[in-house]
Amino acid sequence: MQQFTIRTRLLMLVGAMFIGFITIELMGFSALQRGVASLNTVYLDRVVPLRDLKTIADLYAVKIVDSSHKARSGRMTYAQAEQEVKDAGRQIDMLWHAYQKTKKIDEEQRSVDALAKLVDEAQDPIERLKGILERGDKAALDTFVENEMYPLIDPLSEGLSHLTQIQVEESKRAYDAAVVLYDSSRTMLALLLLGILICGGVFATRLIRSIIHPLTTLKDAAARVALGDLSQSIQVSGRNEVTDVQQSVQAMQANLRNTLQDIQGSAAQLAAAAEELQTATESTAQGIHRQNDEMQMAATAVTEMSAAVDEVADNANRTSNASHEAMDLADGGRKQVMLTRETIDRLSGKLNETTRTVFRLAEEASNIGRVLDVIRAIAEQTKLLALNAAIEAAHAGEAGRGFAVVADEVRNLAQRTQTSTQEIERMISAIQSVTQEGVRDVQQSCEFAARSQTMSSEADQALTLIAERITEINGMNLVIASAAEEQAQVAREVDRNLVAISDISEQSTAGVQQTSEASEELARLAANLNNLVNRFSM
């Protein structure tokens, strides 16, 4: 992994996490779309047909039968009863044709074919009933109601009841399929998310180690340099931002070692010159000329030392420039981390859109619930109508017994409709619960995106620490440059002293003592330089 730059490694981590979360989002969208399609099928092919079948059953059992009985008992005129029967016939035709256009299973289609024959066979008796009501023939109406009405209506009611039961069973099957779809989608998403988290965790751990280990090595090397240990070389491996800094510090260490070696050599030369100068001062006056020659040699050595010090200053300046370049690279890494955080923010926006989609699904489920409320209200009204019909049949005595049977069947049908509506309500509640769990899953994905953003912030902090360490190295370069400047000043001062000693030696013999003192000062300076260099282990 050291062969890749930190930027490349971070992009690989974020890219892998981004692809994983996009995959989860697409799978979630797919599951939601299939769930919406299932709900749409339940509503259009089951709930609406259930409503229409219930209405058709009510039209046969309430409108036609009830109007006939009311016309017999005189509570409704024959013209009103005829109009009620005609209206019921038109509504039955309209609803029946609409129902036949819906999607059906094989069992349902067979029941529809059988019921269609009964509906067609009922047309002629109903037309005769219309004619009886139009003529106002009470005897014919009594005969029709007692002999033909219930043999006509009862098979129709049974067929409609059977179709209603099929709608309920198919709604239950659709619900079971939706539950299976939800369970499989949830398991798949959970496994995929777990795999992404495990892979991301392993990759992130390796990434952190690949950054921390070379930084720790670099820190230890810098600490050794600060303690004066220049004997151990810095190991450089890989091609990334950290290795660039390692190479810069390695070059700085080598330059510092060479500089100290030059200083050590110059100090040795200076010590030798001082000893020679001391020997010359102990000689007789005849040795003054020879002493001047030695002074010239000492001046030459100081000049060489000054040149070496200038070279040290130049090396320190080049090291400072390398540190600035490393700082620029660290700033570039921080900018890449900022781009990574922006990418994660866009991912969070996509997850928020997914949440809004799930909420719309919940709203659609609530709309279905309102439709069920309407169906339940119709069932309650039907039960009340059946109860009223039973009461009226009881008032009619023996003549209303058949009508009482029909009213009881209508009430039972309304009760079954109400029970089916409650079952569908439970299904809708389960779907809403599943939708809420989907919202929580998407919110967890948002939290994982936020954690990825936190990891990017930590990488930014790591780059900031690198920049701080580079600043410290730059400060060390400034210290080295300052020391070199001080050494140059000392060399120039020594040169001036040598010139003064030479002048004094030429003027008088008394200057021999002063020259001796100057030579002793030079010896001390050489010893100090040696002590300073000996602090470093090379």
From Swiss-Prot:
Compartments in which it is found: Cell inner membrane
GO MF, any single term: transmembrane signaling receptor activity
Disruption phenotype: Mutant grows on naphthalene but is not chemotactic to this aromatic hydrocarbon. Mutant has a wild-type chemotactic response to succinate, benzoate, salicylate and 4-hydroxybenzoate.
UniProt xrefs under SMART domains: HAMP, MA
Pfam families: 4HB_MCP_1 (PF12729), HAMP (PF00672), MCPsignal (PF00015)
Keyword field: Cell inner membrane, Cell membrane, Chemotaxis, Membrane, Methylation, Plasmid, Transducer, Transmembrane, Transmembrane helix
GO biological process: chemotaxis; signal transduction
Membrane topology: Multi-pass membrane protein
Tagged with keyword Membrane: yes
InterPro entries: Chemotax_Me-accpt_rcpt (IPR004090), HAMP_dom (IPR003660), HlyB_4HB_MCP (IPR024478), MCPsignal_dom (IPR004089), T_SNARE_dom (IPR000727)
Domain of life according to the entry: Bacteria
Sequence ranges on the Cytoplasmic membrane side: 1-9, 209-538
Periplasmic side: 31-187
SUPFAM superfamilies: Methyl-accepting chemotaxis protein (MCP) signaling domain (SSF58104)
Transmembrane in keyword set: yes
Methyl-accepting transducer domain ranges (all copies): 266-502
TM stretches of this protein: 10-30, 188-208
HAMP domain mapped to chain residues: 209-261
Listed GO CC annotations: plasma membrane
Family: Belongs to the methyl-accepting chemotaxis (MCP) protein family.
Function recorded in the entry: Chemotactic-signal transducers respond to changes in the concentration of attractants and repellents in the environment, transduce a signal from the outside to the inside of the cell, and facilitate sensory adaptation through the variation of the level of methylation. Chemoreceptor for naphthalene or a related compound. May facilitate biodegradation.
Record-given protein name: Methyl-accepting chemotaxis protein NahY
Gene: nahY
